From Swiss-Prot:
Keyword flag Transit peptide: yes
Pro residues composition-biased segments: 415-431
Any single GO BP term: starch granule initiation
Intracellular or extracellular location(s): Plastid, Chloroplast stroma
Record family assignment: Belongs to the ESV1 family.
Organelle transit peptide: 1-19
Biological source species: Oryza sativa subsp. japonica (Rice)
Gene field: ESV1
Protein name per UniProt: Protein EARLY STARVATION 1, chloroplastic
Primary site of residence: plastid
Known role: Binds preferentially to highly ordered alpha-glucans, such as starch and crystalline maltodextrins. Involved in the organization of the starch granule matrix, thus influencing starch turnover by modulating the accessibility of starch polymers to modifying and degrading enzymes. Required for the control of starch degradation in leaves and starch distribution in nonphotosynthetic parts. Promotes gravitropic responses, negative in shoots but positive in roots, by facilitating starch granules (statoliths) formation in hypocotyls and roots columella.
Length: 431
């Protein structure tokens, strides 16, 4: 919706699940460990409705009902593919949102603020500073008004101060239609203190007359680790959208963490629902900056009738030696379970031990000559995130008086890791 002299105009709401349960796109490789054979990637796993009738013959699986390909015994082909989309079937869901231009807001005594009311898009990861276009004022503002059609708007900003040099510059804006059925809110902020902590963030939410609602939060942080004394940058994003006309919606949580010595952690939790079907996905990457890498993915889906299916894999490598393993599984409404497990051991000498079995009796165990390949470094690391965080780095803290030093609490524990519980649908901030 856009607020202007003629009022708020609500745009249609889209809950397209084209990105439902997608794998992360393969990234350009910078440096990798090669040993002496052919490249291997993560295994392909898909499931179809036909697979429910004969799961023991399933090697590739889809949700779109395509005919599954039978698996060759004793041999495994490895590749990385995306879990297929689960589109919302309603006509509204087929309409695509156009990217809105980001235009100036928060001009004191200017026209009514305009909203980036477009719901967040699925599987777009963490936006950049430039995409958010945060522009805070140097003066306090508190304004409100009513448009010709009876819709209202408000805009305010401030500068809060606290102990230890804490400073928070912020801006809030929003509006709603005359009957309150359409509403939007947006908040920006930047924080800093004498410890070197800096934070840049934004949050927006909205709803329309059809009952659809959405919410998005973005944040990036710079701080110095108390124990390692290394600078760290962390970025995160949370997004959700709900349909007001059907039992449909989705939620995503993304995070990235970097330090100045190459330690990197990335991950995401995703959840979606379309009437009688729900799906989840979790994945993570960890690089210790000294050559060790861990990657994993776990995704699954289920229907209200009791059918469940999923796929997961994991790989660990260091200095050319490591392993890969995974499982594909399916449970029928009657409780019958089928699964196939597989694994690879890479010895770093050109030999790879491959093994696996399924609940239908197939099995394999052999050693082959193959090259070991894996990404030893993240495709996007410390140097990249520093280059893309110019606004965060330019935040100016309150000047510290001579002889006054920041208070650092070494007893404070580090932030808890993300929960392993499946992400659900948190309530909308507008409810």
């Amino acid at each position: 919706m856009a607020a202007c002299s003629r009022g708020l105009v609500a745009r249609p709401f889209d809950l397209t699940a084209r990105g439902a349960a997608h794998w992360p796109c393969p990234a350009p490789r910078r440096r990798a460990i090669r040993c002496c054979c052919r490249a291997q990637q993560e295994p392909r796993r898909r499931l179809s409705k036909a697979a429910a009738a004969a799961p023991e013959r399933t090697e590739e699986w889809r949700i779109d009902g395509n005919k599954p390909a039978a698996a060759a015994r004793g041999r495994r082909r490895a590749s990385l593919t995306a879990m297929p989309s689960l589109p919302f079937p309603s006509p509204r869901s087929r309409r695509q949102w156009k990217q809105q231009n980001f235009y100036p807001r928060c001009t004191p005594r200017g026209p009514a603020p305009q909203s980036r009311d477009t719901p967040p898009k699925r599987d777009t990861g963490i936006a950049s500073e430039k995409e958010w276009g945060i522009n805070l004022l140097d003066e306090a503002v508190k304004e409100s008004g009513t448009n010709e059609d009876g819709s209202t708007w408000y805009r305010e900003s401030g500068d809060d101060r606290g102990d230890n040099g804490y400073r928070c510059r912020w801006a809030r804006m929003g509006g709603q239609s005359h009957d309150g059925t359409t509403e939007w809110k947006e908040t920006w902020w930047e924080k800093s203190d004498w410890t070197g902590y800096k934070e840049l963030g934004a949050e927006k939410s909205g709803k329309n007359g059809e009952g659809d609602s959405w919410w998005e939060k973005w944040k990036e942080v710079l701080y110095q680790d108390e124990w390692s004394n290394l600078a760290r940058i962390e970025r995160s994003a949370e997004k959700q959208a709900k349909s007001g006309a059907e039992n449909a919606g989705w939620y995503e949580k993304w995070w990235e963490k970097y330090d100045a010595k190459g330690w990197t952690e990335k991950g995401a939790h995703k959840y979606g629902r379309l009437n009688e079907q729900s799906w989840w996905e979790r994945w993570g990457e960890h690089y210790d900056g000294r050559g060790f890498v861990l990657k994993w993915t776990d995704k699954w889906a289920e229907t209200d009738l009791g059918t469940k299916w999923g796929d997961k894999w994991e790989e660990k490598f260091f200095a050319g030696i490591g392993s890969r393993q995974g499982e594909t599984w399916h449970v029928s409404p009657g409780g019958d379970r089928w699964s196939r497990t597989w694994g690879e051991e890479h010895f770093g000498n050109g030999k790879v031990h491959k093994y696996g079995k399924s609940t239908t009796g197939e099995s394999w165990d052999l050693v082959v000559d193959e090259e070991t390949y894996y990404e030893a470094e993240p495709h996007y690391g410390w140097a990249d995130v520093v280059g893309d965080s110019t606004q965060l780095l330019s935040i100016q803290p309150v000047e510290r008086p001579p002889g006054v030093y920041p208070t650092i609490d070494f007893s404070a524990s580090s932030p808890a890791p993300p929960s392993d519980d499946p992400p659900g649908m948190p309530p909308s901030p507008l409810e």
